[in-house]
Design a protein with these regions (language model features):
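Amphipathic alpha-helical coiled-coil segments
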Residues: 74-89, 173, 177-200, 207-214, ...
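Small/polar-residue-enriched beta-strand and adjacent coil segments characteristic
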Residues: 76, 83, 92-172, 282, ...
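Short, solvent-exposed, mixed-charge loop/turn linkers that connect secondary-structure elements
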Residues: 203, 222, 241-288
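Transmembrane beta-barrel architecture of outer-membrane proteins
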Residues: 58-60, 135-137, 183, 228, ...
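Sec-dependent signal peptide recognition
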Residues: 1-8
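Bacterial Sec-pathway N-terminal export signals of envelope proteins
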Residues: 16-88, 272-302, 353, 381, ...
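C-terminal motif of bacterial Sec signal peptides marking the signal peptidase cleavage site
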Residues: 12-14
């Protein structure tokens, strides 16, 4: 069952995106054009591919898994964060406009003013006068960094690629984790069947041990035979307990995946599906190029390339325009009077001269991140090919093993019948 889910997942991964990449541009060896698979049935898959198993318990579990799984929720939030970062970077290309207003009240006295100034004010040197003043202001200001070298545009490109990378990684994680969740579901079915067989073995071992105990008490068998039967019974009991522990562990893991208390209450069918799905006879290698995890790595590589270029452009001068228009008056009623209007405009130039090597280090860091992104992309590409090659080999091996088992069953029936 696990190999069926693996092959289905590989097929869905390839059909999840329609934006192919070109592996030959990043690897220097030939890749297969297609894989031949000896399976007769062709099926179309959608995002809810687990419905093809016709298992109501599985369907309920998968729906709850998609709604409640913590990893999927975190991936969705990371995609939202990346989208907002892209919005912020796009906004940096446009002028910023703001409105400011204020009122200031100040008080000043003539204490400590030289005598000559006191005389000018028409007061004696011993007299202290208090002045109170209010000022009202209202202004509209703007600032705009001129993206002369394209530094801000590279930042916008990088954040957009990061958003797309996060989006495709979310798609990949959804496909990958749903495949793992369905494998866990069928692993529980298998574990319960193994536990059921272990329970029957334990019951048989207990019956044999009771029979040997009865014969030993009557003196019909030796103590060695009695002890050997007890050893077999204890070993069978220990094996049953281990199988029970395995079932409970798998059920707790399933409950944990849906953000629920890890109890052992989990419903599954008693048997595997009678009709198993298949994949097409021939799979084109092009489906690997459309895997969402590879698309995510590709966008991550493009984002790091843009950040590398942006780090280089930070070494260039920065130009920005600023200006404001408003009014300032000691009387609130005069704020709308044109005689009290104030304005300013200017061009600011910032040229980095000395920063202890921070900009150079930032450029080298961006270059290293770009090289790491390239290695991650190549590794993801090779891993994708490895998974498909291993999956097909496992499928062929399992089919041969199934043929051998069926042959052994037929031989056993001929012997005992």
């Amino acid at each position: 069952m696990s190999r069926i889910i693996l092959l289905i997942t590989l097929f869905i991964f390839g059909c999840a995106s329609q934006k192919p990449i070109k592996p030959n541009q990043v690897v220097n060896f030939d890749v297969p054009e297609q894989w031949e698979v000896n399976i007769s049935q062709n099926l179309d898959f959608d995002q809810k591919w687990w419905n093809i198993f016709n298992d109501d318990n599985l369907n309920s579990f998968m729906v709850e898994f998609i709604d409640e799984n913590i990893s999927l929720e975190k991936a969705m939030l990371n995609t939202r964060k990346a989208k907002q970062a892209s919005v912020i970077a796009t906004g940096s290309l446009l002028p910023s406009i703001s409105i400011s207003s204020g009122v200031v009240e100040s008080e000043q006295n003539t204490a400590g003013i030289p005598t000559v100034f006191s005389a000018l004010l028409g007061q004696s040197s011993d007299e202290v006068t208090v002045f109170t003043q209010e000022n009202y202001n209202l202004s509209l200001g703007t600032q705009w960094e001129i993206d002369l070298w394209g530094k801000l545009r590279q930042g916008r490109i990088a954040t957009k690629q990061q958003y797309l990378s996060a989006k495709y990684f979310e798609d990949f994680l959804k496909l990958s984790l749903t495949a793992e969740a369905s494998k866990l579901y069928f692993a529980i079915i298998e574990a319960e069947q193994v536990l059921n067989n272990a329970s029957k073995k334990l019951k048989n071992a207990e019956t044999i041990f009771e029979l040997y105990s009865l014969r030993y008490n009557k003196g019909s068998i030796s103590i060695q035979a009695y002890q050997q039967s007890k050893i077999i019974f204890n070993a069978t009991k220990s094996d049953y307990n281990n199988k029970l522990l395995m079932v409970n562990s798998l059920k707790r893991e399933a409950r944990l995946l849906v953000k629920d208390y890890p109890s052992t209450e989990f419903l599954v069918n008693n048997n595997f599906p009678k009709k198993l799905p298949s994949i097409p006879n021939t799979l084109p290698a092009d489906i690997v190029k459309r895997r969402p995890d590879l698309i995510a790595q590709q966008y991550n590589l493009l984002a790091n390339k843009a950040l590398d270029r942006q780090a280089l452009l930070t070494l260039f001068p920065t130009f920005s325009l600023s200006g404001s228009y408003g009014s300032s008056s000691n009387d609130l009623e005069d704020l709308t009077n044109e005689d009290f209007s104030v304005w300013n405009r200017g061009l600011n130039v910032f040229m980095p001269v000395f920063n202890a090597g921070k900009l150079i280090a930032n450029k080298r860091l961006a270059k290293s991140n770009r090289e790491i992104a390239m290695l991650d992309f190549v590794n993801a590409l090779l891993t994708a090919y490895k998974e498909i090659e291993s999956g097909f080999e496992s499928d062929l091996t399992s089919n041969k093993a199934l043929e051998i088992i069926n042959e052994n069953i037929a031989l056993s029936e001929n012997i005992y019948n």
